[in-house]
Amino acid sequence: MKELKIEPTGAAGWRVWFSSEENPVLVARHHWVGVDFDGTLARNDNIGHCQPPYPLGEPIPEMMARVKSLLATGITVKIFTARACEPQNVPIIQDWTERNGLGRLEVTNLKDFNLIRFYDDRAIVATFKNQSKDDNL
């Protein structure tokens, strides 16, 4: 995973090249980037991972570097995880992010219209273009 190219655009936010194969994305100051926790930011192959108390894995260096580069420019990063369904897990994950040099990041399981990018190890990526009523589905 290559380091992100990020250019400030003044008050508007940043121009971010999330991939060398894509055009840059304007990330406004109100936008945020979501990062899944298990299997994306933290390893999920640790002993007992799938059994209570569901221990947290070690950091994944490549994604940690990507998150640090986003945070260093001022872009908001939130941990997006199903673990947040149980509120007692939120401070545990925040402690982990703080211990691992990311600061105390917001942890959520809710999307909103300001989520501009999402990193996940299990999501299926699909891109849809606007279709006219004449297009076949």
Predicted regions: what is each one?
Residues 2-137:
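HAD-like aspartate-dependent phosphatase fold
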